[in-house]
Amino acid sequence: NIADQNGFAVCYPQGTTDAWGDNFWNVGYDFHAGVTVDDIGFLETLASYLQSTYQLSQSNTFFTGMSNGGEMSYLLAFDGSNVFKAFAPVAGTVFPNGIITNLFTPNTPVPFFVTHGLNDNVTNFIGDSNDQYWGSYLSVDTLVDFWVNYNSLSNLNIDTFPDLNNNGKRTISYKYSSFASNSNEVWLFTHRSGHNWGDDGDIVIEQKIWDFFSLYSSNSTEINEINSLNNLLYITNLFGQKVIEKNNAFLFYKYDDGTTLKKVIIQ
């Protein structure tokens, strides 16, 4: 719904299947030792394919995921190239003894949105140096502190959201910034729930993630105007399905000269 309301595309990729029949991203779990799947290469190639196939913005591509997907977010930020502009890991962490190669030495500062439950008993907020299942992993504070320092942020604004459900699971936001106009901010949202997106009912975390990403969306619509077009063949939506023209949606206009016009009619 947030994508429909704000006119951006969302892709939900699936990782490969492990020996137990579960889909996963290869982030360095102990029980995946020896797995050589290159998920960084896969996701960056997928992003490039979607950008070129559907004329999506190369400069406004972001990455988020929960749990294993959150850990993939961290891995991409440290070891990936510059395909993704900002990251939003949810209930994730980093496994320093796993496959990561550029821990604390990423290519460039990037904006970071982190959300994690203080009562998460799957991926503990404080980390675990001797986990017998996943492998040792870092605390949320360690990772947030790194990105705050790496991004040269010195200002902190703390807000506590109203406890709308009166359940004591208050969400608190910590927003790190600097006086520079182009600073790569780091936001941390903590809640009193467990290993989830933050289901305390006080905020919609997906909306907060989009609010953060949209801060770094340059030329957000990036509509490529074509001066001279031939005959229109058909119109498709983001999924390649033929549709009729409608308002407030990304549509692709296919012409008989091979060109495609991406357009949004706003009403």
Regions found by a protein language model. Name each.
Residues 1-62, 66, 72-75, 79:
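Serine-hydrolase catalytic machinery in alpha/beta-hydrolase-like enzymes
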Residues 8-14, 26, 60-65, 71-76, ...:
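Structural recognition of the beta-strand scaffold that forms the well-ordered cores
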Residues 15-20, 118-121, 150-155, 193-194, ...:
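Acidic glycine-/aspartate-rich tracts in secreted/extracellular proteins
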Residues 33-41, 78, 134-138, 199-204:
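Soluble non-cytosolic domains of exported or imported proteins
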Residues 85-169, 174-181:
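The feature captures the conserved acid-bearing segment of alpha/beta-hydrolase catalytic domains
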Residues 154, 215-242:
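Residue-level detector of functionally pivotal "anchor" positions at catalytic/ligand-binding pockets or at interdomain
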Residues 202-219:
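Catalytic active-site module of serine/aspartate enzymes centered on a nucleophile-bearing elbow/loop
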Residues 250-267:
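C-terminal tail/sorting-segment detector
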